Curated annotation (Swiss-Prot):
Gene that this polypeptide is encoded by: rpsD
Family, per entry: Belongs to the universal ribosomal protein uS4 family.
Summary of subunit composition and partner proteins: Part of the 30S ribosomal subunit. Contacts protein S5. The interaction surface between S4 and S5 is involved in control of translational fidelity.
Protein name: Small ribosomal subunit protein uS4
InterPro entries on file: Ribosomal_uS4, Ribosomal_uS4_bac-type, Ribosomal_uS4_CS, Ribosomal_uS4_N, S4_RNA-bd, S4_RNA-bd_sf
HAMAP family: Ribosomal_uS4_B (MF_01306_B)
Gene Ontology annotations of biological process type: ribosomal small subunit biogenesis; translation
PROSITE patterns, alphabetized: RIBOSOMAL_S4, S4
KW Ribosomal protein (keyword) present: yes
Length: 207
């Protein structure tokens, strides 16, 4: 699947907020002007953004946060809409339970992109079986671990150390010494980033 490989800071500036694509622990706020759009002088517009434009921007932001392209994102939305309950919350839970995101949330990768690479390079197991599909859905009770051959990688050790200092989500339990973690349960909406307005995405696809 194609992936955006350009400057990560540019995407955060485009959305006007730090998407933590460079690092989950270090903010870009001190390095670049997040309230200034990309471009030589930072493009500005006096025109009021339409409702559609606002909804579209929110969808683009969430796609970039989780590293998902349009076709796959539409499939996630269709599945979220099919399930019982709140469609927006279902969508976020589907994205949060992707294997690459769970690896990131457990602190094995400093960014989702790095976590995705660990999965693609077969450095991750799920319930003892090697997994190499970043979009694999992790279920409650699944044990995600770093393979023995990858445990000495400096980037993994550093990422895990930083994650321990910053704290991990309550819906994962990580044993840093064993380089493994358990996906305890689906996260509740309050446990997912509060700067996402999923209702705008639901409104967009309901047009």
């Amino acid at each position: 699947m194609a992936r955006y490989i350009g400057p990560k800071a540019k995407l955060s500036r485009r959305e006007g907020t730090d998407l933590f694509l460079k690092s989950a622990r270090r903010s870009l706020a001190d390095k670049c002007k997040l309230d200034s759009k990309p471009g030589q002088h930072g493009r500005t517009s006096g025109a009021r953004t339409s409702d559609y434009g606002t909804q579209l921007r929110e969808k683009q932001k969430v796609k970039r946060i989780y590293g998902v392209l349009e076709r796959q994102f539409r499939r996630y939305f269709a599945e979220a809409d099919r399930r019982k309950g709140n469609t927006g919350e279902n969508l976020l839970q589907l994205l949060e339970s992707r294997l690459d995101n769970v690896v990131y949330r457990m602190g094995f990768g400093s960014t989702r992109a790095e976590a995705r690479q660990l999965v693609s390079h077969k450095s991750i197991t799920v319930n003892g079986v090697v997994a190499n599909v970043p979009s694999q859905q992790v279920k409650a009770g699944d044990v995600v671990a770093i393979r023995e051959k990858a445990k000495k990688q400096a980037r993994i050790v550093e990422a895990l150390s930083l994650a321990e200092q910053g704290g991990m989500p309550s819906w994962v339990a990580v044993d840093a010494k064993k380089f493994e973690g358990t996906f305890k349960q689906m996260p509740e909406r309050a446990e997912i980033a509060g700067d996402i307005n999923e209702s705008l995405i639901v409104e967009l696809y309901s047009r």
